[in-house]
């Protein structure tokens, strides 16, 4: 059996990681993809073993210390799951390196959840002793991210988000038929 290693997104096996998910692999033919707004994706890998993974979380934590069915939405849980899965697949903690993406502020007037998410990810990784070798967080654009865990390559594309209110025009109603004199319409 021949194994091929390439960074060609058209030939790679794509795994889309959605909100609340994580995925880990050592397969050199896999590219992980996600789309982020204020959410964060951490791409963590062991460059020596070739094991890597991506998560995608919505909020840094629940704020109330609960561990319930919604835990997958939160950064602390997502980071723990990703790191533990990497270690189970043969990665070594002392060799892990991270790249983080997302954390945009997409809507004016709302709290900056994206900045909180990015700050959480940076703090968590620092506290765990995992260096961040690259990051692209903040700003006002959503991101499309592709991550090749075996090589560590990441491709990011900014996605335009137009928050300007659209000029909505209501269709002109058709004219009402003329009522013949003496006729009465009852509703």
Swiss-Prot record:
This is Probable chemoreceptor glutamine deamidase CheD. The keyword Hydrolase applies. Probably deamidates glutamine residues to glutamate on methyl-accepting chemotaxis receptors (MCPs), playing an important role in chemotaxis. Keywords: Chemotaxis, Hydrolase. SUPFAM superfamilies: CNF1/YfiH-like putative cysteine hydrolases. Belongs to the CheD family. GO terms for biological process: chemotaxis. Its EC number is 3.5.1.44. Pfam families: CheD. It is an enzyme of class 3 (hydrolase). InterPro entries: CheD-like_sf (IPR038592), Chemorcpt_Glu_NH3ase_CheD (IPR005659), Cytotoxic_necrot_fac-like_cat (IPR011324). Residues 164-187 are annotated as: Disordered. It comes from Caulobacter vibrioides (strain NA1000 / CB15N) (Caulobacter crescentus). The keyword Hydrolase applies. It comes from the Bacteria. It catalyses: L-glutaminyl-[protein] + H2O = L-glutamyl-[protein] + NH4(+). CDD domains: CheD.
């Amino acid at each position: 059996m021949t194994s091929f290693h390439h960074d060609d997104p058209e030939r790679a096996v794509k795994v889309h990681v959605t909100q609340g998910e994580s995925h880990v692999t050592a397969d050199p033919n896999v590219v992980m993809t996600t789309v982020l707004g204020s959410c964060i994706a951490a791409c963590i890998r062991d460059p020596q073993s070739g094991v890597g993974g991506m998560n995608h979380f919505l909020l840094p934590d629940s704020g109330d210390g609960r561990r319930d069915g919604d835990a997958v939405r939160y950064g602390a849980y997502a980071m723990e799951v990703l790191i533990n899965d990497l270690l189970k697949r043969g990665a070594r903690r002392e060799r892990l390196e991270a790249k983080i993406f997302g954390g945009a502020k997409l809507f004016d007037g709302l709290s900056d959840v994206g900045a909180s998410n990015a700050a959480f990810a940076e703090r968590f990784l620092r506290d765990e002793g995992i260096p961040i070798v690259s990051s692209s967080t903040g700003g006002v654009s959503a991101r499309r991210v592709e991550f090749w865990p075996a090589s560590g390559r990441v491709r990011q594309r900014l996605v335009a988000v137009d928050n300007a209110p659209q000029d909505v025009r209501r269709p002109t109603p058709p004219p009402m038929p003329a009522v013949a004199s003496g006729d009465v319409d009852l509703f």
